[in-house]
Amino acid sequence: MQVLILTVGTTREPLEVALAEHAPQGVVFLASQASHPVAAELVRDYGGSFRHHTLLLEDAESLMEAYQKALLALRKALEWEATAIVADLTGGTKPMAAGLVLALTGRGVVFSYVGGEARDPGTGRVLAGKERLRLLEDPTARLGLKEWAGFTRAWNALNLGMALAELESLLRRDLSPSEARFYGAMKG
């Protein structure tokens, strides 16, 4: 089952693009007091084709609350036994999008964003019919943050064999020249 975690703003069209492109079997809506009606409209119009659950934020500008609700959304997706989870950060406030990304990076979630080139000059929003969905790479995977955390834990515990294994794992990644020199020098 693919589950889409969707931040909801007051503009419906890009969210419809995300729903159509991802075609999820389950959707967890992260909505604010102001955007809850948009989530309700989407459920009314499309809810028959997927399971759905809505999490409501009291303060759409609270990064902490957005982070906590995103973790609850992940928990709901896992309760539904999701085999793939996509988190779309198109709608909602900037703190809602940031909280979603902070909570879900490094957890095997694919991120997506509906953008586009043609924008309304007054609002900056993408023009209807000109939307384009983009899949976004989780930067923690590219940067080797999991391996680096494993290295520091092993090093601090004086488990030098494990620390060496984590460094070797980092050295097998596609690294910049300075990263390769740094990790290589640490390995010795």
Which residue ranges define each predicted feature?
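Long, low-complexity, Lys/Arg-enriched
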Residues: 1-84, 98-188
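Short glycine-rich anion-binding loops that position phosphate/pyrophosphate groups of nucleotides
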Residues: 10-11, 91-93
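Short N-terminal targeting/anchoring amphipathic segment
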Residues: 83-91
